[in-house]
Regions:
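Helix-to-loop junction immediately C-terminal to a conserved catalytic motif
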Residues: 48
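ABC ATPase NBD coupling module
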Residues: 64-78, 102
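Short helical segment in ABC ATPase nucleotide-binding domains corresponding to the A-loop/adjacent helical element
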Residues: 92-101, 111, 115
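Conserved ABC ATPase "signature" region
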Residues: 108-127
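Conserved signature/switch motifs of ABC ATPase nucleotide-binding domains
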Residues: 131-134, 152
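ABC ATPase "signature
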Residues: 217-218, 226, 304
Length: 315
């Protein structure tokens, strides 16, 4: 658990963070979102003491971080930044192994962990471990950055706009990768972004910041349904909130189940159980379909979702 109690940060006469109170529960993904200069990255960097806070308290699992050794604190927190921050003269494997080496892990344990994380992040160790960062695509390099942050198995993961410099397709793929990995590793994660759609997709809870203050902290659904101010309403968008709500619910919630599984046919339009209702509606409208088959991770049909059911539900 991470707790910020009336935390502020000043740069001279400028107040960057102003009396922030925030509790991030163990295992949840808290996304800090807001416009540029609102204090979200400053808030993140105070958690691992890259920046000292000017007032208030920051507690990690009940312990005041000012009583902790800052180097040890950072070694126990994964940290991912935009642009990866990889060492260009180190191989992929050595970049990932950096923190375990600093913690004096045995070589065999380090090698096994590097292979495990590369496989988890869809990077073939035999093909990529000996490469250097400049030999990777942007998406591959960002995956290596995430692997490095997870290498020592920290309880807390801090991510400062990690996908902000990537193209839209790579960004979406990495967002899906993060959701998949979070289901497996369950890290307490603080994620900074200026993209409300990214926040809605990734967050357990969202903290909306403006002028150094948190003006709403709630679940994605509650923020969409009950914005706390005009600023929040403008941030999430007034015209497409219904579509954003559809993006939060998976197809499995509204599909009609089948008892006889089958494999999909070549060229057939299908959906995965974890795909959003918004995507289902888009496919139906684009292809002029009344229903679409839904398949599980094993490629077996588990049900269908219909246009009528989506309209009936009203999401």
């Amino acid at each position: 658990m991470i707790e910020l109690k009336n935390v502020s940060r000043r740069f001279g006469d400028t107040v960057a963070v102003d009396g922030v109170n925030l509790t991030i529960e163990t295992g949840e993904v808290c996304v800090l979102v807001g416009s540029s200069g609102c204090g979200k990255s400053t808030t993140l960097r105070m958690i691992n003491r890259l920046l000292p806070h000017s007032a208030g308290e920051i507690l990690v699992d009940g312990e005041d971080i000012t009583t902790m050794n800052p180097e040890q604190l950072r070694l126990n927190m994964g940290y991912v930044i935009q642009g990866t921050g990889l060492f260009p003269h180190w191989t992929v494997a050595r970049n990932i192994a950096m923190v375990p080496r600093l913690l004096n892990w045995p070589r065999e344990r380090i090698d096994a962990r590097v292979d495990e994380l590369m496989t988890l992040l869809d990077l073939d160790p035999s093909a990529h471990a000996s490469k250097y960062p400049q030999q990777l695509s942007g998406g591959q390099a960002q995956r290596v950055g995430v692997a490095r942050a997870l290498a020592a198995d920290p309880n807390i993961l801090l991510m400062d706009e990690p996908f902000g410099a990537l193209d839209a397709i790579t960004r979406e793929n990495l967002q899906l990768e993060m959701l998949r990995i979070q289901k497996q590793v369950r890290k307490t994660t603080v994620f900074v972004t200026h993209d409300i759609d990214e926040a809605l997709k990734l967050a357990t809870r969202i903290a909306v910041m403006d002028q150094g203050r948190i003006i709403q902290h709630d679940t994605p659904e509650n923020i969409l349904r009950h914005p706390a101010s005009d600023f929040v309403e403008n941030l999430i968008g007034k015209q497409d909130r219904g579509l954003k709500l559809m993006s939060l619910r998976p197809v499995r919630d509204l599909m009609a189940n089948h008892t006889e599984p089958r494999q999909s046919e070549p060229g057939e339009h299908v959906l995965r159980e974890e795909d959003s209702i918004r995507l289902a509606l888009f496919v139906m409208l684009w292809q002029d379909l009344r229903q679409v088959a839904v398949f599980n991770a094993q490629g077996q049909e588990t049900g269908v979702i219909t246009r009528e059911r989506i309209i009936q539900e009203g999401v």
